[in-house]
């Protein structure tokens, strides 16, 4: 993306904190997106990568203590390794990133706040629990507590901040396995729905195939929550585009978030299909890149974030997407998806 592209996509939006109308008259909350540095207005977000990672710790839960923990890694080292990758995004026009590492997998809001300040990027963190990978990253209490009790934990992070940092989540991150929803997966979805109703935070669900995706939509419907409050994460792992179209028509956000050199052509085709069905307004895009791997020397092989801008956006242009389409996908849709707003049926 060259300088002309940067200006065209509208990257000069000022950073503004969300607030309220003057006292003495009816107060209406401004639309808000919650970053690790505090609230901003949606028009301040700018072009966004909607699903990336700064670090992850896949060690078994028994080897780690309660979140956040720096016992297994040096935050200063992670900062030094990751910061150049974030700084490399700014010349390409990127201004924001949703960081998807959940609790009990290395979520570190304080580190993200440092990286945000140093890089100039808006970073979002999350609340919620990750039930994918056969539940191995769920703390034991998840299996015994009710959905309401889990929701209360997540709501507390919204009202009080995460683990004493004062940093509030910008979305709800849950994970489910790739088959029909298990009992604990279903509980996580209900807890997320109830958290959304009390906070307005959007639900991003690590999902993949269509079967658990549509089962989640049914749970949300039972809870009275609109599909527009839910992001189908890793939707590219469902190979029948008809399911993407069906979910988008129900109002869900469909996230094609595995953009990489090996998957570029597939992601272009998926986006083109959604354009052909006039559904680009329900699509989110990202790479699932980065990944300082705790336990590997120097964090292992960090995948740069810039491929999205250097290769993927030009490939979308070559496939017939217009500049208005790209603005929709990189600016308008992310701002709408991550705006804090209760969305009921």
Language-model segments: residues:
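Catalytic pocket-lining loop regions of alpha/beta-barrel enzymes
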Residues: 193, 197-276, 283
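Short acidic/histidine-rich active-site segments
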Residues: 204, 257-258, 279-302
